[in-house]
Amino acid sequence: MDKRRFLEALGEAFLPIRPAGQIVLANTLAKELFQEERLEGRKVGALVCNQELLGHVQEAFDTDGPVTKEFTLSAANSPGGVQNGITAWHLDSAITDTPIKEKRILLRNVTQNYLTNQMRRDFVANASHELRTPLTIIVGYLENLMEDNLMEESPGLARKFIGVMHQNSQRLMNIIEDMLMISKLESGHKAILKEQWFHLTSCVDDVFSRLDSIREKKQAALHMNIPPDWELYGDPFYWTQVLFNLVENALKQNTEPGLSVTVAAARTPEACVITVTDTGVGIPAESLPFLFNRFYRVETHHSSEIKGTGLGLSIVKRAVEAHDGAITVSSTPHRETVFTITIPLKRFREEKEA
């Protein structure tokens, strides 16, 4: 295998660079990374505006022996044209044995891995916080029951304490169940689905029945606009969970009476489209990009009163994606919020032909 074919087979952006900063050659992935057709003979400093990245490259040149390091950059002027956020990079370098000493540099964009690891760290931190709160309450009330002998001296107060502990133990169970559900969806995706043809109306009926007490308390109206024979191919358990989370979320987020929530479904030439629309207070525009993140909660004047695990919409997104679908959200403050689920019809055609 010649040098050029070897470089193309690396699977990484590869840039042998001379000490003066001149690029000796570059493979296709390096050209894609810098969005340039011709890199050979050019200087790195002429290609990269980000002084942080140039600093790391220069440090690799100035260091005797091989260098391996990972670093993050502000993304505004990073290679690849990313305009916001953070990019993460892995740099390896070594000195050649050729008469003209070159510092070979292997530069990789590892942003996706960085973000995945960051998400895991955030999840552990958030999960620990969410679990600690009800556990602390339960332990505190148990200590009072044991130390003050309340069961005998004040049975009424003791029953109240037990009720609080039961409520928080239920919250713990809900968090754990939601975490397990997300874990299943992310690890197995389609492998965990028990797919079959089913009527979507049966899922909606189940959801409305389970949420009827909240609907009545909120003085809200629940509507369904789906043909009776409308069928989906998928796991009815997860579709029921998706619709339950979306409708429950609409009911919980809106405190004023008169709310209307509508679940509708229709077919386009290319997709099945399911929408959940509510006529409530809406969602601030700045919150929309983060809405499906784990434990994210929209900040409102009554957000502290809303009970939940903070995982409901994350479960919705992953369950929809497990069915090859996509979900988006749009919101007009004080008018309506619409969650739109799109599932390609190709998925159903393939199943019917199988």
What does each model-identified segment do?
Residues 1-34:
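Sensory modules in modular signal-transduction proteins
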Residues 196-197, 216, 221-230:
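Conserved catalytic submotifs in the C-terminal HATPase_c
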Residues 167-172:
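Short alpha-helical segment of the dimerization/phosphotransfer core of two-component systems
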Residues 44-112:
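PAS-family sensory/regulatory modules and their coupling/dimerization elements
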Residues 283-295:
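Short conserved segment of the HATPase_c
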Residues 187-193, 231-234:
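Conserved micro-motifs of the catalytic ATP-binding
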